UniProtKB/Swiss-Prot annotation:
Organism domain of life: Bacteria
Presence of keyword NAD: no
Binding sites annotated in the UniProt record for dimethylallyl diphosphate: 41, 74, 124, 225-227, 269
Names of required cofactors: [4Fe-4S] cluster
Gene behind the chain: ispH
Alphabetical list of CDD domains matching this protein: lytB_ispH
Similarity comment: Belongs to the IspH family.
Catalytic activity: isopentenyl diphosphate + 2 oxidized [2Fe-2S]-[ferredoxin] + H2O = (2E)-4-hydroxy-3-methylbut-2-enyl diphosphate + 2 reduced [2Fe-2S]-[ferredoxin] + 2 H(+); dimethylallyl diphosphate + 2 oxidized [2Fe-2S]-[ferredoxin] + H2O = (2E)-4-hydroxy-3-methylbut-2-enyl diphosphate + 2 reduced [2Fe-2S]-[ferredoxin] + 2 H(+)
Pathway the protein takes part in: Isoprenoid biosynthesis; dimethylallyl diphosphate biosynthesis; dimethylallyl diphosphate from (2E)-4-hydroxy-3-methylbutenyl diphosphate: step 1/1; Isoprenoid biosynthesis; isopentenyl diphosphate biosynthesis via DXP pathway; isopentenyl diphosphate from 1-deoxy-D-xylulose 5-phosphate: step 6/6
Organism: Haemophilus influenzae (strain PittGG)
Chain's role: Catalyzes the conversion of 1-hydroxy-2-methyl-2-(E)-butenyl 4-diphosphate (HMBPP) into a mixture of isopentenyl diphosphate (IPP) and dimethylallyl diphosphate (DMAPP). Acts in the terminal step of the DOXP/MEP pathway for isoprenoid precursor biosynthesis.
Protein's name according to its UniProt entry: 4-hydroxy-3-methylbut-2-enyl diphosphate reductase
Membrane-spanning ranges: none
List of catalytic residues: 126
Length: 314
């Protein structure tokens, strides 16, 4: 069997920054460091940080007063920020700057009283944080996931409307939903370029090319990773068998029936270390050649908070 590697794949700038924030906070301040929600959606990464002293919680009520807490890359609502401030928690914010950009769009709509429509997945922490930027009772923010949801929106054609999207959605599904929104609400405003981030876009485009050459596409990523799930879905829609896996232990013998070429990619929160461990396992199943596709070079970089750039000196 032959292995073909997608490019780009794996960590994006926002994930790199978020992990660095937790690592630096542990190095500078020592354990325990509390993290609200999984800092990124990858089991391997989270377990590694937990082993080093990070404590992952879902609510700030689980964090002692005055402790250090890190907000995950997915962002938090204004209510969570206020709660942290009221309880005198020391906060390091690992929210991806591209998520923060969407937060600013929602906050702007809230200040103006413009009704907002967010395209995203209900229950995802990024969506909860983004929805939580809207506080104007004279307007409102409404969540839709697909074209069919548009019919139940309560707004009128002449309402002042704007839309924004979760950053990790399917490019194809989102384009279809935006087109349907504009058809129903011709005057609706939105971002000049959709809010789906560069890493999601690049990895989906890379999988399109990978799937054309593969009998099976393996996506390295955790089940709760939105962008990883979209990669597996995209390959399946192209008629190619696909599997989402956390690590080599997930690999099953029957995946390789009639498979001559295996394509491998990784979600934006999956480290290259996992990709290489899966390649090693595939060699045991008979994979004997590896090819890496050419792809877009990514050079995006996001700084960590200033307080974490220089070690404290006693």
């Amino acid at each position: 069997m032959k292995i073909i590697l997608a490019n780009p794949r794996g960590f994006c700038a926002g994930v790199d920054r978020a992990i660095s924030i937790v690592e630096l906070a542990l190095e500078i301040h020592g354990a325990p460091i509390y993290v609200r929600h999984e800092v990124v959606h990858n089991r391997f990464v989270v377990n590694g940080l937990r082993d080093r002293g990070a404590i992952f919680v879902e609510e700030l009520s689980e964090v002692p007063d005055g402790a250090i807490v890190i907000f995950s890359a997915h962002g938090v609502s204004q209510a969570v920020r206020q709660e942290a401030k009221d309880r005198n928690l020391k906060v390091f914010d690992a929210t991806c700057p591209l998520v923060t950009k969407v937060h600013m769009q929602v906050a702007r709509a809230s200040r103006k009283g413009t009704k907002a429509i967010l395209i995203g997945h209900k229950g995802h922490p990024e969506v909860e944080g983004t929805m939580g930027q809207y506080s104007n009772e004279d307007g409102g923010i409404f969540l839709i996931e697909k074209v069919e949801d548009i019919a139940r929106l309560p707004m009128q054609d002449n309402d002042d409307l704007t839309f924004m999207t979760q950053t990790t959605l399917s490019l194809d599904d989102t384009a279809e939903t935006i087109a349907a929104l504009k058809e129903k609400y011709p005057a609706i405003q939105g971002p000049h370029k959709n809010d789906i981030c560069y890493a999601t876009t690049n990895r989906q485009e890379a999988v399109r090319e990978l799937a054309k050459l593969s009998d099976l596409v393996l996506v390295v990523g955790s089940k709760n990773s939105s962008n990883s799930n979209r990669l597996a879905e995209l390959a399946s829609r192209m008629g190619i068998k696909s599997q989402l896996l956390d690590d080599p232990s997930d690999i099953q013998d029957d995946w390789f029936n009639d498979v001559k070429t295996i394509g491998i990619t990784a979600g934006a929160s999956a480290p290259e270390e996992l990709v290489q461990s899966i390649i090693s396992r595939l060699k045991e199943f008979g994979a004997n050649t590896i090819e890496e596709l050419q792809g877009l070079e990514e050079n995006m970089f996001f700084e960590v908070p200033k307080e974490l750039r220089i070690k404290e000196v006693n």
